[in-house]
Each structure stands twice: as structure tokens, then as C-alpha cells.
Amino acid sequence: MEYKTIRRSQYISPFGVGAIYDFSGESMIAADINKWAGDYGEILRLKRLESRLNIKYFKAPTTYNKFNSTRINMKYSIPFERFPKWLFCKICGQMEYWGRAKEIENKIPMCKKEKCNNKKLTPMRFVMACEKGHIEDIDWRYWVHSHKTSTNDACKLDNQLEFKSKENSSGAALATVACRACGASRAIKGISQKKALTSIGIKCRGRQPWERADKEVKCDGEVRAIQRGASNLYY
């Protein structure tokens, strides 16, 4: 993952907590204040608003410091998390789940296949959000196999999914996700319709992209697929 800079005012809007930030073909989401740098950050006093919200004070977003021309003091930076974590190669269609363990400082996700010549991986177009504000990756393995009664063990591997789209097409209606292990496939057309995910048993896991699995809470909010660049994903 590379380091990028934004103005502090932009962290209020348009890149506030939960907003998607696209840069150089990568997609990130701004983490909440629980991930901010401890006691750092200028305290701001707005007494009337503090009273209205029943809080003690406000804090300005922290700004990072550089040790030198190459090293950045992460203690002061505002964290962003890669989101969505499901990516695909535009050349071969290979899908890959890019979790934290795969992140390397100042490196971008690339396709490992020789014929793709280190092609940068592209984030999937759709993500999932519930009516109570939780945002997650869509479980594409579940989506692909939702019409099948069983799957083999190979279907559970991250490297068995493939994103297919007709040449020169930018419409979701012409795109499919397929499993190389068992041959199952399903079109993305209609995925953003109400009940499209809940009707096949996909539920909210009650956490945000920057939270670990042990932070999951029980949530009965109805989930829906939304394009990651859509304004209603944030506002």
C-alpha cells in the first residue's frame, strides 16, 4: 500500500469517516476515530455544539510528520483501509482477496500470472452495506455458488473466482463472476436490487472494513449491494 496525502479539511468532507477514496486505480475507505493516533490532534472548543451533542470537546484530524524524505511517521497519520478487498485482473479476470497479510509498504496489488505482466489489480465495482451503516465486501464465493446445493473444497480458495465482462462494456448487466473449480457462474445483473443479497442468505456481519473479525456485533440490518463510488454509500 502506498502513502498518499490529502488536505486536513478534506478529511471532514469529502473524505470523512466511511468515505471511499480513489487514487491511481486503488480504492480506500477512511477509518473511524478509534483508529486515530491516540492523544494527538488539536483540541477544538465549540461549547454550544458540545452541549447539544453531549460531548467534552472536538479534535482536529492529525497530520503526519516525515522523519526524512523516505520515511513517514505513521503515529500521526489518519488510517485508510483498502476497500473493497476483492480485486480482479482486467487481463485474465482472476479475482483475489487482498487482505492485510498481503499488504506491503509502497507496493500495489498486481496479478501474478506471467501473461498479465504485473497488471495492477482493479477493485470490484460493488460492495455491500446495511441499513444500519455497516459496510462490507460482498461474499462473491457465496454469490457464485448460491444456486448450487454443494461445492468442493477447491471452491473455498480465494484464487478460484474469475470476473468476466464483455469487451468494451462498462455495464454490470454484461458481467459475471465464475468459479473455475466447479464451473458455477452468476451474472452481476440485478445484484443491486432490493432483497438480491438477503434472498440468497447473505447477512450483515455487523462490522466495518477497518475492524477485525472479533469486533463483529449482531446486526439484523437488511443488506444491499451498492456501487462503491455511489454517493448514497457515504451520505
Model-derived segments and their meaning:
Residues 1-235:
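Extended, Lys/Arg-rich, non-catalytic nucleic-acid recognition/anchoring regions
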